[in-house]
Amino acid sequence: MNYQVLLYYKYTTIDDPEQFAQDHLAFCKAHHLKGRILVSTEGINGTLSGTKEETEQYMAHMHADERFKDMVFKIDEAEGHAFKKMHVRPRKEIVALDLEDDVDPRHTTGQYLSPVEFRKALEDDDTVIIDARNDYEFDLGHFRGAIRPNITRFRDLPDWIKENKALFADKKVVTYCTGGIRCEKFSGWLLKEGFEDVAQLHGGIATYGKDPETKGEYWDGKMYVFDDRISVNINQVEKTIIGKDWFDGKPCERYINCANPECNKQILVSEENETKYLGACSYECAKHERNRYVQANNISDNEWQQRLTNFDDLHQHA
């Protein structure tokens, strides 16, 4: 494989995010990179892809900047680009937690756990493991025994914690996310909320899966990623599928977006059921006049109406 996908972040001061984003986009395009990068006054959060040569040049360029000299890059080999375009966008935050009283992870954050230390935490009955990701990420794969917050956006996590605080009373709390950036701020928020014993998986799931000692042990399913790959393997010890098809509940690890552009819900679905149910999550979405699956596959009105009856069969067997 001649391509690489880079996942990285750094909490650091960027005085002029708008100008930085403009200059950074020009640099990335000049080096034929593709991806999505967020920048703010609090730092940078990015995922991008390119050839090994191009990504090595990018990492060298970033490490030459005093602000990013010790930034850690998580690297995956790939067969091609993981993105279709290159975006660098200035934002208020590099992860959207939207706190009234913001947390600076450079000053307040949970204890860092190495992959080996995190594995011990997974084995400890007195430790609560919280998945800091969204529900659709959890449903594709997660650490065994982890708590699933019922959220679709990271910014909803603090409210969920407040509503379920009794679950964590007098327990050690350990949190994890994809690459570590969400936990840097979330674990700091937990400390400010009065939780005394708070830790986080340093480097996230991505680092844990590559650790030569843990080898991704106790991870079930696949890890959701925010690029064209959709998911990647983590557990090198054993293979399990925990995702379930949206329609029939059978084991499934294939995510699609609902074909209704006004819905766009992410669902796990087999190719067979995607065809059967017109790429939609519901009857209402399947019959939507701008159904993308219908348009992309040039399905006639008669065939469209015929396949809509599949939802009748679905309800009869529910």
Swiss-Prot record:
The keyword Methyltransferase does not apply. Residues 123-217 form the Rhodanese domain. GO terms for biological process: tRNA modification. The active site is at residue 177. Gene3D superfamilies: 3.30.70.100, Rhodanese-like domain (3.40.250.10). One of its GO terms (molecular function) is oxidoreductase activity, acting on paired donors, with incorporation or reduction of molecular oxygen. Pfam families: Rhodanese, Rhodanese_C, UPF0176_N. It is an enzyme of class 1 (oxidoreductase). Disulfide bonds: none annotated. Keywords: Oxidoreductase, tRNA processing. PROSITE patterns: RHODANESE_3. HAMAP family: TrhO. This is tRNA uridine(34) hydroxylase. It comes from Staphylococcus aureus (strain MSSA476).
